[in-house]
Amino acid sequence: MFGSDLYIALILGVLLSLIFAEKTGIVPAGLVVPGYLGLVFNQPVFILLVLLVSLLTYVIVKYGLSKFMILYGRRKFAAMLITGIVLKIAFDFLYPIVPFEIAEFRGIGIIVPGLIANTIQKQGLTITFGSTLLLSGATFAIMFVYYLI
């Protein structure tokens, strides 16, 4: 489900995210994240890995890096993105020794874990994960119906 499907899912995810944010005031981990995760929503191991790396990114920046650096605003956002990228690269190095489901993690947008982690620090874990999974599921469902037609 890539190529033009990726573009359709991203546009759909952005539109759903905008509508959701306008109606509820809750931002689902960046506008592009539900589109990316909607593409792989039928692979629970993959979704769990993305959420795990996002949580790990948040914990490393909040309780690790922020003890040694002054992080706020753009600096904190950059630290979240860079930490997420470094963790994803670490997963890429583990590729030969991990199961196939984890190897598929290599295909996800490299900034997705950082975007989710940044939203966790703003809105909290439950709200971020809940809204992101809700909109990713909605994106997946709409794409599924699109394929049936």
From Swiss-Prot:
Organism of this sequence: Bacillus subtilis (strain 168)
GO CC, alphabetical: membrane
The protein's name: PGA biosynthesis protein CapC
The protein's role, per its UniProt record: Required for PGA (gamma-polyglutamic acid) biosynthesis.
Phenotype of the disrupted gene, per the record: Cells fail to secrete PGA into the medium.
InterPro entries the UniProt entry points to: Capsule_biosynth_CapC (IPR008338)
One Gene Ontology biological process: capsule polysaccharide biosynthetic process
Known outcome of mutating T57I: In strain: IFO 16449
